[in-house]
């Protein structure tokens, strides 16, 4: 499972393509991770918008206040898991990125 991704293209270009009025910090990010506000493209009935969101979801059934957001889903079981079953049909977005990777620590 991947826990990091890379943004190297200027987000400003994405803003122009999407025709969004959102202003975002336009830095390269070679270590985009779940605790950061990161750019996505979302579609609404009146058009597309660029939004900054934190990566991950907290399922509606999670009761603990310190529940860690889910950041990955397996495509093989996404339509079976309670956490994603409804969301996959109704709530989608485009994640602005150039690539993704899994962090590997060596001793």
Residue spans of the language-model regions?
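Short linear sequence motif anchored by a di-proline
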Residues: 1-105
């Amino acid at each position: 499972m991947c826990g990091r991704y890379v943004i190297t293209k200027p987000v400003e270009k994405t803003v122009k393509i999407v025709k969004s009025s959102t202003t975002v910090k336009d830095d390269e990010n070679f270590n985009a991770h779940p605790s950061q506000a990161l750019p996505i493209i979302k579609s609404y009935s009146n058009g597309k918008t660029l939004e900054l969101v934190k990566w991950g979801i907290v399922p509606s059934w999670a009761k603990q206040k310190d529940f860690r957001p889910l950041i990955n889903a397996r495509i093989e079981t996404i339509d079976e898991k309670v956490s994603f079953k409804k969301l996959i049909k109704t709530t989608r977005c485009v994640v602005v990125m150039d690539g993704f990777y899994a962090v590997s620590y060596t001793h």
